[in-house]
A protein has these predicted regions:
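An N-terminal alpha-helical hairpin/helix-loop-helix interaction module that forms a charged
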Residues: 1-135, 148-184
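Short hydrophobic alpha-helical segments that form membrane-spanning helices or hydrophobic packing faces
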Residues: 138-144
Length: 184
């Protein structure tokens, strides 16, 4: 899309078509953030966190699917969440960096999520970058908890595209961590 096409699309866009949907979505987001406080996150069970058991009322389902319109990470591998339930194998799968058992892995992942949320509140970029969660997952969580601070674009290639498009390429930003590219 060239700049003139973008300007034309922007000028002819009818915001009223999605305004009510957006309001409902942000009401749901407010409920999500109030439900999943750092303390509540630390108490999640495997079934309350992980997709794969068939239910839709899990933390990861809400992050990925309920708020898809606020930035999509759908289509990513389930491993983006650190741990997932494989119906084919009837077991949990997770990389060894998170722990030796599903419970240990979950505990580590939940602690990382809480650390990320706290680092996002403090705008502690170093802690956010150092956090072991998958980059796209970190981006989605930060944009849900702090939508006024962190952009809801999770692909590094898309971030680079929009930085170029809007002439925001000074200071070597294109070669920096995606976290730095997402900060508003």
């Amino acid at each position: 899309m060239v700049r003139s096409e973008f300007e034309e699309a922007k000028n002819s866009f009818d915001y009223s078509l999605f305004e009510s949907r957006r309001k409902k979505l942000y009401k749901e987001l407010d409920k999500f953030v109030k439900r999943y406080t750092p303390n509540a996150i630390l108490k999640l069970s495997l079934r309350e966190y992980v997709q794969g058991h068939g239910g839709q009322d899990t933390f990861t389902y809400h992050v990925e699917r309920t708020f898809d319109e606020l930035g999509t990470i759908s289509g990513s591998y389930c491993s983006i969440f650190g741990i997932f339930y494989s119906k084919n194998k009837s077991q949990y799968s997770f990389p060894p960096k998170w722990g030796d058992t599903p419970k240990a892995a979950l505990k580590s992942i939940l602690e990382s999520i809480v650390d990320l949320i706290e680092a996002g509140a403090e705008r502690d970029t170093k802690r956010i970058i150092d956090n072991q969660l998958a980059p796209m997952y970190k981006g989605k969580l930060l944009s849900l908890y702090y939508p006024e601070v962190y952009l809801n674009i999770f692909s590094d290639e898309h971030l680079k595209y929009y930085l170029h498009f809007f002439n925001q390429t000074s200071g070597g930003i294109l070669s920096k961590d995606p976290v730095l590219k997402r900060e508003r």
